Amino acid sequence: MVAFYKSFSAYIQSITRWELLTFLFILLMIFCFIKRDLSSHIEGFEQSDKYKVYENDSIYDSFYADIYDELFIQPNKIEAEVDEIINITGVLNNSDNKNKNFKIGDLGCGRGHHVHELTKKGALNVVGCDKSNAMLQNARDLYPKCKFIQGDFMKPMLFSEEEFNVLTCFYFTVYYVKDKRAFLRNCYQWLKPEGYLILHLVDRNHFDPVVPGGKPLFIVTPQKFAKERITNSLVKFRSFQYKSDFTAPPPSSAKTGEKNVGKFVEKLIDDKTGKVRENIHTYYMPTNREMLDIAKEVGFTITGQVDLVHVLNEYQYLFILKKVA
């Protein structure tokens, strides 16, 4: 699948602008029919208030868990990330994997897709951790043979010292964490010597904040053809409309706004009642350099970086942090 996306991306770059626009128009029509069919089973949200606001942890209830994949999941990206974990850590060739002593933990596992993919490809001791009971219930329903626990990874006692060979933190999870130093210190404590933390980070000023569900088949980013960065998304479900907008942290020279704090705001509007559910995600987004400097101060060595452009996620990266013995 990853190889297909590489080849397809090369093909897209080779055709003329008019050919590309025609191709995208056809794909958009196909996408609209597919999306309408895929989202037909999603029921509308129910609330007594005309306008209700959810923030951070409270957002991840059963309704949001049910629509999450429609908005955010990219199977090719998950597969690519798991392949990178396997290649970097050598888990499948490690003798400890056979007796389940090679342990991988996915922090902020959500609906459990990475845990499942790792298990499917041969990692025998993988556990997913998330704070949201609703997301974990979805994960357990989807993947009953995988292991999941509910917990807050900001609590040092959640896991034992030197329990894991590998920890992962994907898809903006780290940006919900205000105290990055405490988070990295916990990870360092839980890792065995020579263990890895694989961390998803983005270039906050250039990554594409349009949700995957709002892009036709994930073929090409509209940012390439926009004069200004597109920050808003629109997805139509059967009985409600989804809108989102991302506001990047202000520049360091700005006189207003909180340093390193961005906002991702979602609005879900019921077609019949007009009631609105607003989700406010607060992202604590230091620059990648600032983040990696903190990691070094905690004790990590930065051993590598994977650019996710090959799965059409430009300006998004996996950084490989190692606890050197």
Regions found by a protein language model. Name each.
Residues 20, 25-98, 113:
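Conserved class I S-adenosyl-L-methionine
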Residues 105, 111-156:
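Class I SAM-dependent methyltransferase SAM/SAH-binding core
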Residues 158-166:
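A short acidic, Gly/Pro-enriched loop at the edge of an enzyme's catalytic core
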Residues 165-179:
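A short SAM/SAH-binding and catalytic strip from SAM-dependent methyltransferases
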Residues 199-292:
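SAM-dependent methyltransferase
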Residues 284-325:
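C-terminal lobe and adjacent flexible extensions of AdoMet/dcAdoMet transferase-like proteins
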